[in-house]
Amino acid sequence: IIIATIKSWNIENAKILQKQHLGIHEIKIIDNKEEFVLEKIKSFQPDIIFIPHWSYIIPKEIYENYKCVVFHMTDLPFGRGGSPLQNLIVRGYKETKISAIKVTKEIDAGPIYLKECLDLSGSAEDIFKRASDVIFSKMIPKFLLEDIVPCEQDGDIVSFKRRTPAESELKEEMDMETISDYIR
């Protein structure tokens, strides 16, 4: 098993998972882009690669040769694309689902293995940490215990664009709740 992530809260949870599965599963943690290359992946020969938070394009030669599962913070096919948390908050959502999907050529369009609910209250960091806890305590363990068959995404596709700093500028006409959502 490989876990590829760049966020500290995911790295911490991956290390906990490593300890919990010592002697059961060999888990390698990759926390930088330079290590996430085919040659290094080949040397480890993983059965599955989990990608809980990765800000880079996943190389085609990796997802075509290995089972790669990415975790996306929307109820797909709603919310494909960049800045999912920020886009949900700006649209007033109070909860979402984390979708575990098969990595394919098209971003966030792969078949869905499973989904879990996620509360969007608190700061962005609180939400990311809560998402990490859901991924590592509920979702990844299901993969390790069951043979989950993914299903094609069903429903209307709604795509998000990566938000820019200019889109997060405060405006005079905003009410307090909107301002709170912009700065959390």
Regions found by a protein language model. Name each.
Residues 1-184:
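One-carbon transfer enzymes
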